[in-house]
Curated annotation (Swiss-Prot):
Assembly: F-type ATPases have 2 components, CF(1) - the catalytic core - and CF(0) - the membrane proton channel. CF(1) has five subunits: alpha(3), beta(3), gamma(1), delta(1), epsilon(1). CF(0) has three main subunits: a(1), b(2) and c(9-12). The alpha and beta chains form an alternating ring which encloses part of the gamma chain. CF(1) is attached to CF(0) by a central stalk formed by the gamma and epsilon chains, while a peripheral stalk is formed by the delta and b chains.
Organism: Oceanobacillus iheyensis (strain DSM 14371 / CIP 107618 / JCM 11309 / KCTC 3954 / HTE831)
Keywords: ATP synthesis, ATP-binding, Cell membrane, CF(1), Hydrogen ion transport, Ion transport, Membrane, Nucleotide-binding, Translocase, Transport
Protein name: ATP synthase subunit beta
Task of the protein: Produces ATP from ADP in the presence of a proton gradient across the membrane. The catalytic sites are hosted primarily by the beta subunits.
Annotated CDD domains: ATP-synt_F1_beta_C, ATP-synt_F1_beta_N, F1-ATPase_beta_CD
MF terms in GO: ATP binding; ATP hydrolysis activity; proton-transporting ATP synthase activity, rotational mechanism
Localization: Cell membrane
Alphabetical list of PANTHER family matching this protein: ATP SYNTHASE, ATP SYNTHASE SUBUNIT BETA, MITOCHONDRIAL
Topology of the protein relative to the lipid bilayer: Peripheral membrane protein
Length: 464
């Protein structure tokens, strides 16, 4: 393969000149070796003219210098795929980072850059994916083979929610899961690995990490590494795969970090001008085909709780369901802090979820909306000034709001309370009975952090 030399190092961006050799194609992988024998993988981003290319480093450039020899591998970064990846932990390059044995030679590797599936191969069936989380299943149900976004600011519970979904869905689903940790805390990845090992889910899960401490190149490409592994299970084995990504915002953030160094003019709020294109290329590959499905659940950080920020706003367009986490709810101790009025799903349709479910969900939202409108009056004049009808709306809305909370299995070590998994039918039944006024005489606190409606009745007896 052709060889070149490093002419410039600017943090994660490296310029390479190929004197007489053919220039490597954009997205091709290059390898540099330092004097101490360390290897650094680069990915070609731009052709600069003058036989030079500008590349993005996939690991730290410390210890490398100008003049170092660079080898063109003649292909994009390629990562291992197939059953050998299950139960293992990899980095962006598909190198193992767990303590198990190295992978055997000759394992199939696929390039991380691929085209999205053709239109005629896409599947359009709509089937509900039960999560066991009441607020999600009732008001913003997830679609099998769909794309789901968990939106929230810092510290409102995105990662805990995604871990609960892994716990509930991966165990119930029994199929294959891929987890991509993109620019998040290493500690959380470590905790997740051991939790999955303890529960046995790890045997059917491939994990890929490019965490906060890694250079932007790794954080920008690690989502594609995880996606490539998921695509193999979908296309070659016809599996229904779960793809968890935590956090998709860090993918955008990493692109923004290298964008200026690559010489691109910044766009709105300093983001890269190619933001929508990069997001589209990633999201269009996460889809269901006539061979199998990829259901993706993506945590999306919302900077300063501003949903109009270009990064979360660009992601919205690609999703089938959104679960919006609200800081005000977490401050009230309502967990999961999912906003029941802002969260959306295209599956909340009588044709998909059934007439009863749809009517109960709509009535719950109407009751909560009425309560939200009355809150200003309550704050200024107090409850006594409300009509009897409005007082009843407020009482039921508060019970609904508390009943939308529940304990999580993954938070048991913090709360000391066992987690609860609530089937959809039980969820619909519980809210229907609250709306009918069956539990108007029970204290509000009995509805807080419980699973089924029967638990509310038991809790209320203990409070007497």
């Amino acid at each position: 393969m052709s060889k070149g030399r490093v002419t410039q190092l600017m943090g994660p961006v490296v310029d390479v000149r190929f004197e007489d050799a053919e220039l490597p194609a954009v997205n091709n992988a290059l390898v540099v070796r330092s004097d101490s024998g360390e290897e650094l993988t680069l990915e070609v981003a731009l052709h600069l003219g003058d036989n030079s290319v500008r590349t993005i480093a996939m690991s730290s450039t410390d210890g490398f210098k100008r003049g170092a020899e660079v080898e063109n591998l003649g292909r994009p970064i390629s990562v291992p795929v197939g059953d050998v990846t299950l139960g293992r932990v990899f980095n962006v390059l598909g190198e193992k980072i767990d303590l198990d044995e190295p992978l055997e030679e000759g394992v199939r590797r696929d390039p991380i850059h691929r085209e999205a599936p053709d239109f005629e191969n896409l599947s359009t069936e709509t089937e509900i994916l039960e999560t066991g989380i009441k607020v999600v299943d009732l008001l913003a149900p997830y679609i099998k083979g769909g794309k789901i976004g968990l939106f929230g600011g810092a510290g409102v519970g995105k990662t805990v929610l995604i871990q609960e979904l892994i716990n509930n869905i991966a165990q119930e689903h029994g199929g294959i899961s891929v987890f991509a940790g993109v620019g998040e805390r290493t500690r959380e990845g470590n905790d997740l690995y051991y939790e999955m090992s303890d529960s046995g889910v790890i045997a059917k899960t491939a994990m890929v990490f490019g965490q906060m401490n890694e250079p932007p190149g790794a954080r920008m490409r690690v989502a594609l590494t995880g996606l490539t592994m998921a695509e193999y299970f979908r296309d070659e084995q016809g599996q229904d795969v779960l793809l968890f990504v935590d956090n998709i915002f860090r993918f955008t953030q990493a692109g923004s970090e290298v964008s200026a160094l690559l010489g691109r003019m910044p766009s709105a709020v300093g983001y890269q001008p190619t933001l929508a294109t990069e997001m589209g290329q990633l999201q269009e590959r996460i889809t269901s085909t006539d061979k199998g499905s990829v259901t993706s659940i993506q945590a999306i950080y919302v900077p300063a709780d501003d949903y109009t920020d270009p990064a979360p706003a660009t992601t919205f367009a690609h999703l089938d369901a959104t679960t919006n986490l609200d800081r005000k709810l977490s401050e009230q101790g309502i967990y999961p802090a999912v906003d029941p009025l802002e969260s959306t799903s295209r599956a909340l349709d009588p044709e998909v979820v059934g007439k009863e479910h749809y009517e109960v969900a709509t009535e719950v939202q109407q009751t909560l909306q009425k309560y939200r409108e009355l809150q200003d009056i309550i704050a200024i004049l107090g409850m006594d000034e409300l009509s009897d009808e409005d007082k009843l709306v407020v009482a039921r809305a508060r019970r609904i709001q508390f009943f939308l909370s529940q304990n999580f299995h993954v938070a048991e070590q913090f709360t000391g309370q066992p987690g609860s998994y609530v089937p959809v039918q039980e969820t619909v039944k519980g809210f229907k009975e609250i709306l009918e006024g069956k539990y108007d005489d029970l204290p509000e606190d009995a509805f807080r952090l419980v699973g089924r409606i029967e638990e509310v009745v038991e809790k209320a007896k203990g409070m007497e």
